Amino acid sequence: IIVLDADNNVLSDNIPYRYDGNIWSFDSNNDEGKTTIYYDNKATVYLAYFPYSKEADNVINIDDLKGKFLPQGDQRSKDAYRASDLLVWSDTSGRPLKKLDIVFEHAYSLLSLSPSIKCKINGRRDFTYVPSSISDVSFNVGTEPLFPYQMNDGSYQIIISPKRAKVRWLYEYNKEMYSGAMPDTDLSANTCYTFTPVLKDIGDYTLDKAQMGDFYCKDESNNG
């Protein structure tokens, strides 16, 4: 958390807090000599962000924060993906506050790609899934390839700076390369853009079409 006065002088400089699932509390284990924030009647601007970094010391606005947390080009690891997802909040009401009602927003845009197989379950319900044989996934928003993180649901996601851009994607499936693109679009912060190209429609999914890695599930009526 960062607190400023009306002249943008820093009153509380990049103070770390932790969240336990219920409440925020000062991180007393920080080794930077920082102390908790107290009410100050000179305070007029409050900034909060996540994840914490000591590199944000002396920052006085959201744009400066973004400069410290640029999205990484290779987000294939969980650490790189999370480090790219800057969350921000600010209160510029010009009055001192005794309580901060922080509601974070994503500072950047999110691209999500789910190349899918389409089928019907029990001949009636449409269903799509991302096959496990998808590989070598990348996005292009300019000249350099960007490498996304694979989520638990199989989708490939990458965080990028908001801008006007033409998004392209590329991936391999069954030893063939597939590509697609979205036309020039003004990408907005705190917004997810989802792409769901259908690789093929296999119609009714029956056991004779089962492949390694498929899951077998039953509904509440015990139907497979």
What are these model-predicted stretches?
Residues 1-120, 162-163, 180-181, 186-191, ...:
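Short, low-hydrophobicity acidic/polar segments
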Residues 123-192:
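Contiguous ligand/interfacial binding patches
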Residues 34, 118, 131-134, 204:
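Intrinsically disordered, low-complexity regions
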Residues 202-215:
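Disulfide-bonded cysteine-rich modules in secreted/extracellular proteins
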